[in-house]
């Protein structure tokens, strides 16, 4: 069937209006190709009288009225499957790593329905991360959704990289990394890190374990809006082959922000704080597809930027509803020099249930949170009256809480190059044992400095000996 042709009638920035014959109008989300150019337009609105409003997925420089546009009749399709492994692609699935074309034998549209309810497969299996505070307070479920929330510069990307280091490298399945509106430098660093670790196999790309899709900060809003869907489509294809997939998104907030830009360009009335009126629906459309079926699983880890450290902002607040575990990074904890700067009182997980994690893990986690909460309440009294005015049991609580706080810190493998301290992976059993000993008072004789930036509790005892020497 010959492709229907239309012509550009208006071009305002990234928004392009195209006129088609009235009896052959394209559908919403159809991809249109500009004749003689690589530019793709995606239909967003039908304006009537044969005119459709589209968003340019690429620079609209040089476009003018009267240029001919062809309707492909389908949504944007991207390559999926083995051909994408070890490659860096853009929103349209074109390679940007200068290593030749990506094999297009298998392709899939980026818009599709979420799996039906009866196809879903809830999982109670835990995913060990090797990061103490996460494994103890907000354990991850295999096939679950995790959000890393934090303001600017508190360590979302470093935490994300450490999770990739600890899970993806030791994980038998495949990973997909979607860089949505983040720094190009970070995308480049990630690629080289994956190459050094052998996750990207330079000799035989098809034996790699990760596919990368980037639509970074410098891209037009259309690219940043759709790049998360492109990455998700690739992850879904691996899942439907029966694989266990890790899907990393950095950063989901930029997806919302791109939606805001597009919404404003399309002339929609903004809602709260200037966000698009369709914020919840757009977020739901993406998040409902990130799910595990009876065939395979997608475990997703998403970094979520929190504007002005305000968790009640509509964008992070909308994201909260879709997640199984939330890891909240706090500027106050970062300012104490405790990294990862995870707030153990704000972070939550559906998996932290005695029937899932076991009675011992649950009790230790709740005791740790209880001790820290009591310390938080006592801090005002300490600030006004000093430590000496506290009751003996409160003094003990404060001492233990400060040790717990420091023991929640941990040297990261990915930060080794900056700190010089070798990274530590701590198993869940060791994590529980360590915190149980602190809560039980078996470490009351150790100085609190011995707990700072160590792995297991045994290392804290070793460090205490060195400090005493």
Swiss-Prot record:
Gene Ontology MF annotations: ATP binding; ATP hydrolysis activity; proton-transporting ATP synthase activity, rotational mechanism
UniProt xrefs under InterPro entries: AAA+_ATPase, ATP-synt_VA_C, ATP_synth_F1_bsu, ATPase_a/bsu_AS, ATPase_alpha/beta_chains, ATPase_F1/V1/A1_a/bsu_N, ATPase_F1/V1/A1_a/bsu_N_sf, ATPase_F1/V1/A1_a/bsu_nucl-bd
Topology relative to the membrane: Peripheral membrane protein
Stored Gene3D superfamilies: 2.40.10.170, Bovine Mitochondrial F1-atpase, Atp Synthase Beta Chain, Chain D, domain 3, P-loop containing nucleotide triphosphate hydrolases
Localisation: Cell inner membrane
Major place of residence: membrane
Keywords recorded for this protein, A-Z: ATP synthesis, ATP-binding, Cell inner membrane, Cell membrane, CF(1), Hydrogen ion transport, Ion transport, Membrane, Nucleotide-binding, Translocase, Transport
GO cellular component: plasma membrane; proton-transporting ATP synthase complex
Residues that, per the record, bind ATP: 150-157
Catalysed conversion reaction: ATP + H2O + 4 H(+)(in) = ADP + phosphate + 5 H(+)(out)
EC number(s) from the headed UniProt entry: 7.1.2.2
Domain of life: Bacteria
Transmembrane segments annotated in the record for this chain: none
Family recorded in the similarity comment: Belongs to the ATPase alpha/beta chains family.
Function per UniProt: Produces ATP from ADP in the presence of a proton gradient across the membrane. The catalytic sites are hosted primarily by the beta subunits.
Quaternary structure and interacting proteins, as annotated: F-type ATPases have 2 components, CF(1) - the catalytic core - and CF(0) - the membrane proton channel. CF(1) has five subunits: alpha(3), beta(3), gamma(1), delta(1), epsilon(1). CF(0) has three main subunits: a(1), b(2) and c(9-12). The alpha and beta chains form an alternating ring which encloses part of the gamma chain. CF(1) is attached to CF(0) by a central stalk formed by the gamma and epsilon chains, while a peripheral stalk is formed by the delta and b chains.
NCBIfam families (UniProt xref): atpD (TIGR01039)
Name recorded for this polypeptide: ATP synthase subunit beta
